[in-house]
Design a protein with these regions (language model features):
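N-terminal subdomain of nucleotide-sugar transferases
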Residues: 1-60, 95
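Active-site proximal beta-strand in glycosyltransferases
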Residues: 100, 117-137
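Donor nucleotide-sugar binding/catalytic pocket of nucleotide-sugar-dependent glycosyltransferases
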Residues: 149-199
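Short hydrophobic beta-strand element within catalytic cores of glycosyltransferases
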Residues: 294-297, 304-308
Length: 372
């Protein structure tokens, strides 16, 4: 059987795979490489270092500088797209006729490149981007950033029709698949790729609730504030909040002596221990689009998982989580769950259900059929 080659164009350098978007990019490319696909990885770089790990894993790795000039903000096309045009990338892609997998709307400018007409070009959609940016605008307090997010959202909504030029769209959630299928042909749901090999949850009980996330992101810091001020304000149950770069306004909430603890900038090992030993991992979001990969982390490694319904949207994980959409329901569910043991039966249920949808081995076989 002849060698199979695939170009993957990534919006960022996907290693270390330590935030939502690049987790799917890296583990998808790794799964393909382990199946013998020769991966030609093309990365736009901005504030991340070149990676020997990637260069050792894949057939070839190329890097391209993002054009982050403020002039890009005044173009009619979205900044996340216009800052990722590269003539060097086009010339590299023209050296052969291998199929091209474009990661996100961010890299979809290549769909408009006439020199690539006739090439198989597939887009992996990571979000419904205009909805994502609109939600970023809603929770942003800085006026300049708020204007930028609203403006980018409007541009993304207009620009999205470029996806009609792709050969196929690979959605990351069922919710996104439903949306894109209403507007475009050839849409397939391919679940997120991830690092988790097995369900590693502990039986028994923990003695705290954990919320974790990148706390420099306004949506996450707002969720943490909501939990402190509205859910745990009168609960006699400990809350730990862990994550990157918590803003001063959030830090100040943890100086009042309540049974709450802020753990800033935990390393991966410390965060994994916090997830594993919590009795409840709680996750809330204002975004319905995409897939929240931290939800998979808590299901593979934690005990009870309490979420709002937006966290589950299109994930096919509803049966494995407890849902509460307001502060009163959350208080009620937390009190109830603290009287329950996490049992082996629950772990077995997770193994079965996660293995059906989020099995990297099965999903990479489907991906190879679609893409290569």
């Amino acid at each position: 059987m002849p060698e199979q080659h695939l170009h993957i164009v990534s919006f960022d350098i996907p290693f270390p795979a330590n935030y939502g978007g690049v987790i799917d990019v890296f583990y998808k490319a790794e799964a393909l490489a382990k199946k013998g696909i020769q991966i030609h990885l093309h990365c736009f770089e901005y504030n991340r270092e070149h990676s020997k790990e990637l260069e050792n894993l894949f057939f070839s790795v190329q890097y391209y500088k993002r054009n982050i000039s403020k002039k890009q903000l005044f173009k009619s096309i979205p900044y996340i797209v216009s800052s990722r045009f590269s003539e060097a990338l086009v010339l590299n892609l023209l050296k052969d006729d291998y199929p091209i997998l474009l990661e996100g709307l961010h890299t979809s400018g290549l769909l408009d490149e006439p020199r690539l007409n006739g090439r198989k070009r597939i887009v992996r959609t990571h979000n419904i981007e205009h909805e994502y940016y609109q939600n970023l605008a809603r929770v942003e307090n800085d006026l300049f950033k708020k204007y930028y997010f609203y403006n980018e959202s409007a541009k993304l909504k207009r620009y999205e029709k470029i996806l009609s030029k792709s050969d196929m769209l690979l959605s990351i959630s069922k919710n996104d698949e439903k949306y894109f299928s209403q507007h475009y042909n050839h849409v397939k749901f391919v679940p997120a790729f991830h690092p988790f090999k097995k369900v590693d949850s502990l039986i028994g009980k923990g003695d705290y609730v954990l919320y974790h996330g990148n706390l420099s992101v306004p949506e996450n810091s707002n969720a943490a504030k909501f939990l402190v001020n509205n859910v745990f304000n009168d609960l006699d149950i400990p809350l730990k909040v862990a994550g990157l770069n918590p803003p001063a306004q959030l830090r100040n909430l943890f100086n009042n002596g309540k049974d709450i603890e802020l753990i800033p900038n935990p390393d991966d090992k410390a965060l994994n221990e916090l997830i594993k030993h919590a009795h409840i991992n709680i996750s809330v979001t204002a975004q319905r689009t995409g897939l929240k990969l931290k939800l998979l982390n808590t299901l593979y490694n934690g005990r009870f998982c309490l979420v709002n319904d937006k966290m589950l949207s299109g994930s096919k994980l509803d049966d494995l989580c407890i849902v509460a959409n307001d502060q009163w329901k959350m208080k009620q569910k937390i009190k109830s769950l603290f009287n329950e043991e996490f049992t082996k039966n629950k772990i077995d249920d997770r193994k079965e259900k996660l293995g059906v949808v989020y099995n990297n081995g099965n999903n990479v076989d489907q991906l190879i059929e679609l893409v290569c």
